[in-house]
């Protein structure tokens, strides 16, 4: 186990850190920050990401985390002060991680999800002690099951788990609106854009660089073992404002926002339903007191107005990523026409 730190310490001294994944929306920023702070960083994945290349000086090991033999071969006898797992989603995968990393690390950090918190919430703000229950979304239930496996291993085998629950963390490549680039296209074309509910429910969006400040700050801290932490921004915006910030970033003064009940969207598009009903349709306000007590210098400083501009600028500079989803175009046309007419949506 690594040495305890004073509570006021902003970060640990250089540590050996393994990030499983390391090139995703959340993990790439964590990799970059950990390397910038002087940690000895290794990432383990199946290959490079063109969108988020690994920083210079970071060691890359190639193995498929689902193939335990290949991971053991890649790691050999190495130990790490902290292992951060960004790509375990099911209880079987969590159990495999316990098998792989028990005795190999002083801290195993599991990236869960704030969508695991009680839906609908019975009180705000949401705390780490808020019950974990999501009857709408299998993804969230699987994350809850992962946590149960890992905390059982902590209680029964001293497996050094720390659980982190982020909520809607983004980088420049991820558009927060349900329709993604299709919604930007519709705004610029003067077409109506569908917003779930009445657009007034509150949402939090956290830039991956802000997330990384808190996340890297808890790596290598023994006092975090056996604990769970929410990591989000403290900015809460209604969905109407989120859509308008994207419109402004896209050069559209006033988008036509048409409101459609989340249940109606879910009935018309089963693939969108779980995420809408199990996450986005509920107002969320998170209390970050616990992570700030552990990492006192953590403050999310990137407002989403800046994030929206960064996202649109990146897509404008990368035309190959400007992919229109024709199914979503058709769904939006159908449901916005219905919403404005008051008639039953055809086929809905």
Named regions from a protein language model:
Residues 55-67, 87-88:
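Rossmann-fold cofactor-recognition segment
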Residues 217-277, 288, 293, 310, ...:
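Mid/C-terminal beta-alpha module of Rossmann-like enzyme folds, strongest
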Residues 177-183, 196-219, 226-227, 240-241:
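Substrate-positioning beta->alpha
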Residues 15-39:
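N-terminal Rossmann NAD(P)H-binding glycine-rich loop of SDR-like oxidoreductase domains
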Residues 147-173:
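Conserved beta-loop-beta element that borders a ligand/cofactor-binding pocket
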Residues 124-148, 177-181, 204-205, 236, ...:
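Short-chain dehydrogenase/reductase
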Residues 76-125, 144-149:
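NAD(P)-cofactor binding segment of oxidoreductase domains
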Residues 113-138, 152-157, 174:
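Active-site "gating" loop of Rossmann-like NAD(P)-dependent oxidoreductase/epimerase domains
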